[in-house]
Structures are given as C-alpha cells and as structure tokens.
Amino acid sequence: NYTWDYSLLTSTSQTIDTIFDEASTGSLLSLYFIDNGFNPNRSNQCRHGNSFSAGQVNVSDVWDFFYNSSASFAQPGYGAIVNGAPLPIAFTPKDIIYQFPLTYNSTNVSLSGYTLDLTTTLGIYYSVEKTRSNLVDGWGTVTTPYGTFDALRVMSTIVEVDSFYIDSLGFGFATPPIETVEYKWLSPGKGVPVLQVNTAVGGIVTGISYLDSMQTTATAEIASAISEITLFPNPVSKEL
C-alpha cells in the first residue's frame, strides 16, 4: 500500500485527449476496424494521431484504434490517409495494453507487430516487432495537482525492434532493440491514467502527463485534459 505524492508537479503545457467511437472516423478505416465479432481487427474506440509528411508521402487523418472489453484493452492497429487514400495497418497479433482483471502483482506479456510496404513510394519495406511486459507493482493513493486518487500502478516494459528492407539496394537490416518503460497510475472510473511517466534506458524520463482540469473552453467531445510536465531529478531512481 503506497502513497505517491506528486502534488508539486508544475505543468508546462496542456493537450486534449478525446476518445471517439470507431465508426466516427468517417472513412473506409471504420469499415476495416468495424466493431463486429467476426472481424479480427475489431475495435470500439479510436483516438486522433498526428499528421506528418516524409518525402513524397503525406500522412493525414491519423487514427489509433482500440478494443475495450471485459477481458482486455488492446490496440488492433491504426490507420491514416496516405497520399489521399485510406491505409489501415493491422497489428498481428494485436497489442494487449492491459489484461483484465488488474490486481496487485498480476502480470501479462503481449507480443505484437505489423508490416508496412512502402516500396512504391519510399522504396522500403518496414516492419515492427513489439514485446510488452506488464506488472502491477503497486497500489494505494496518488496525489497530483488535480487531486488524490485510489490507484493501481502498472509498469509496462516495452521492447521494440524495427526492420527495414531497402528495395533499390536489395538488402535489409534491423535496429537494436529499443526499451522503454511506462509507469501508469490507473484509477477506477477514469478513462485515462491519472498519472503516466515514460522512461528510456537508464531511467531517463522522456515524458510525463497527468489528468487535469480544463484550462480552455470545454466541448461535448472532450474526454479529458492532459497536462505535460518536466520532472526533476532526471534520471529518477527505482523509487518512482
């Protein structure tokens, strides 16, 4: 039974995190990830991602798709409009972000990955393999600038390997495994972690966010406000 006190954190910015029904994307992506029991890529939630451009490739209207059930919270894939055409990308297998029920000391391991054929545009073939190892390593109360919450803490160790095949050169290579650790404080009735800390190798903090009150005008679609903060000292110890 822990007491985590992060009440003195100071936010540097605020973003809006909105969860939509999967059918609300208004494109062929919603058909690919339709909420149907016969669909292996079934989803019932989605969230907007960031648009970007890479050379001749323009990526817009990015969506992350999720399936929330009594057994798990998983990501079956994501999709975007690439050069004007919808491109769904299924994770095979899907990424199990949480496996329910979550109780103290419970664990689960999820293997996921996807492939992306960009040989006609960028001349590369890209694939990702991800291993997510979850451990519920604490329970108690956590205090942030927004309030005090009963919470479970989930530690997720994520190891990702990216592979590239360069079509014009006729060879491929894989990057060294990249390990990140996510600490998430989950509280009943909250749709997002009330606090999340992401770290890289050596415990270097790469991102922190906590559930916050709105500092801008609210609308009906807004699910929650997320404040991002800078934490010191950096790196942190295992007492995080």
Annotated model-derived regions:
Residues 235-240:
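Short coil/turn motif common to extracellular beta-sandwich-like domains
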Residues 211-232:
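Residue-level detector of functionally pivotal "anchor" positions at catalytic/ligand-binding pockets or at interdomain
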Residues 1-70:
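Solvent-exposed N-terminal domain segments of exported/luminal and surface proteins
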Residues 48-131, 135-136:
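Extracellular-facing segments of soluble proteins and assemblies that are Gly/Ser/Thr-biased and enriched
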Residues 1-14, 110-218:
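Acidic, serine/threonine-rich low-complexity disordered tracts
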Residues 145, 232-233:
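Single, functionally critical "micro-switch" positions that shape active/binding sites
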Residues 42-59, 123-126, 172-177, 218-224:
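Short, solvent-exposed secondary-structure boundary motifs
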